[in-house]
A protein has these predicted regions:
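Active-site/ligand-binding neighborhood in enzyme catalytic cores
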Residues: 1-81, 104
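Mid-domain catalytic core of redox enzymes
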Residues: 50, 74-236, 270, 313-323, ...
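General small-molecule cofactor/ligand-binding pocket signal
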Residues: 71-73, 243-246, 278
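Short, histidine-centered active-site or binding-site loop motifs used for metal coordination
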Residues: 206-210, 249, 281-284
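Flavin (FAD/FMN) cofactor-binding core of flavoprotein oxidoreductases
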Residues: 224-272, 323
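C-terminal lid/capping helical subdomain adjacent to the catalytic/cofactor pocket in oxidative enzymes
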Residues: 258-335
């Protein structure tokens, strides 16, 4: 799909608060070492990161849930959501180990893809069902590549182990490769690297569609392409230096802003009318939120349940402020 087809709200969300003025302020703020300067999200250079990666956060969360008496059913797939005549959810059906199970509930908090949620629900109005069925997604593949070093030189004042470049991730604009971005896991957290002094873990990221030629590749086939593109980009000199590889695939990693997305407001209105259903997270709201905002949608949901609030606008409006074209009035109405 051509980028010109993407709904404008996607760009608004991803560069919110960012402008030429904001970039210049940030540059001069660094030069003059201005303290307590406000930094736009897109320009943030430091952030907190779990010692062993994002998964560690959810491991701790899961342990707390179980400590408080909650039950977590893993490796299961929700296939149906049951609604009664009063437009209230009553139960769901899930599959695990080849068997079907039913679970009843008072509140249903869903982070599953909206398309799947509505597709598995009974008695959905035709228009809402059509919109949900038409929502597109982009899938994701990554190849971890372990090498002794990379050729990128650290030209900054930021100190790193073995003086590797300090970036956590780098976007690739070269049309000669399929690679969209790569990560340097050493810089995310040194605790994730077994031999920090002598190796570098690189994560090659590819944006694909489930079932396409890349998605159907074996790890060996995918590794051959990934390593060859690292050589093209000058990250390494030869496939012989590769010590190890590992492939992962993620379905529906990115909710896409094409097709029926421009009718999303109608679908949100329908989902909000189901009193005990709360849609959260990136796929739950079909919104390209980062992990921070995804968690906030859950915080807002819990707040509503505890206070008995039936208005879900606060949940659906997380990270929707339109600040990307303008600066505030007290900054001279610059744009």
């Amino acid at each position: 799909r051509h980028p010109s087809e993407i709904d404008a709200s996607w760009g608004a969300q991803r560069v919110k608060g960012l402008s030429i003025v904001a970039i210049l302020k940030d540059v001069f703020g660094k030069i003059f070492k201005k303290k307590n300067r406000k930094v736009e999200t897109s320009l943030i250079e430091e952030f907190k990161y779990p010692k062993l990666g994002p998964g560690q956060l959810w491991d701790v969360t899961a342990a707390e849930v179980e400590k408080l008496g909650g039950t977590i059913i893993k490796n299961a797939k929700v296939t149906k959501v049951h609604k009664n005549a009063n437009n209230m959810l009553t139960s769901l059906t899930y599959e695990k180990d080849g068997q079907e199970f039913t679970m009843e509930g008072d509140y249903f908090i869903s982070s599953m893809p909206v398309r799947d949620l509505v597709g598995g629900m009974n008695d959905v109005p035709a228009d809402a069902a059509r919109i949900a069925a038409g929502l597109p997604y982009r899938d994701y593949m990554t190849l971890g590549v372990l090498v002794p070093k990379i050729n990128l030189v650290n030209k900054t004042n930021i100190r790193t182990v073995n003086n590797i470049v300090p970036d956590c991730w780098v976007y690739v604009q070269d049309r000669n490769v399929k690679l969209g971005r790569f990560q340097i896991y050493n810089n995310w957290s040194p605790y994730m690297i077994k031999d920090l002094e002598h190796t570098v873990w690189i994560g090659l990221e590819y944006f694909v569609n489930e079932g396409d030629e890349y998605w159907n590749m074996t790890e060996e086939e995918f590794a051959k392409i990934g390593v060859s593109e690292m050589i093209k980009l000058g990250l390494i000199d030869s496939p012989d230096v590769v010590l190890d590889v590992h492939m992962e695939k993620v379905k529906k990693a990115y909710p896409a802003y094409f097709d029926t997305y421009d009718e999303m407001d109608k679908l949100v209105a329908y989902l909000s009318s189901i009193e005990n259903l709360y849609c959260v997270g990136r796929n739950g709201q079909h919104r390209y939120n980062n992990i921070d905002h995804s968690m906030v949608t859950s915080f807002e949901t819990v707040k509503n349940i505890l206070t008995g609030s039936r208005d879900k606008k606060n949940i659906w409006s997380v990270n929707t402020e339109q600040e990307y074209h303008e600066t505030s009035n007290n900054e001279g109405n610059e744009a």
